[in-house]
Design a protein with these regions (language model features):
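His/Asp/Glu-enriched, well-ordered alpha-helical/loop segment
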Residues: 2-85
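C-terminal cap of metal-dependent C-N hydrolases
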Residues: 77-127
Length: 127
């Protein structure tokens, strides 16, 4: 693996991506970028509290910069409303829990919505 942490720390744009989705070269691929992010930040050792809040950029904003599509990427007036909604309250929770997608929006229209998972019972492990 290249020196992702060092490149990122020095202001060089770094992004994570996946080009194989359940094919002969990578049968485990499923297009889940949270899995790719999880692997990448573990291997690159980018898990400090300061890094974690920015790690989502590695699979979102930084990819848009690399692909030179920032003129129509992001949540800003005048740009198409293309985004996903994760089942998490924070960046840390999204990464730690590999948050599921609860909605996907393209050009301002919902492609799908689903009810987030709910825990109906709990065990107090401290007893």
């Amino acid at each position: 693996l290249t020196r992702v942490k060092e490149l990122n720390d020095n202001g060089i744009n770094v992004c994570f991506a996946q080009d194989s989705m359940s094919d002969p070269w990578y049968p485990l691929g499923n297009g889940n970028m949270m899995m790719i992010l999880d692997h990448g930040i573990h291997i690159a050792q980018m898990m400090s509290p300061e890094e974690i809040v920015n790690d989502l950029d590695l699979v979102t904003t930084n990819g848009a910069i690399t692909m030179n599509i920032t003129d129509h990427y992001g949540i800003e007036e005048g740009k198409p409303a293309n985004f996903i909604v994760l089942d998490a309250k924070s960046e840390f929770e999204a990464i730690c829990e590999r948050a599921g997608i609860v909605a996907s929006v393209r050009n301002g229209e919902f492609l799908f919505r689903k009810v987030p998972a709910q825990v109906t019972g709990a065990i107090d492990l401290l007893k």
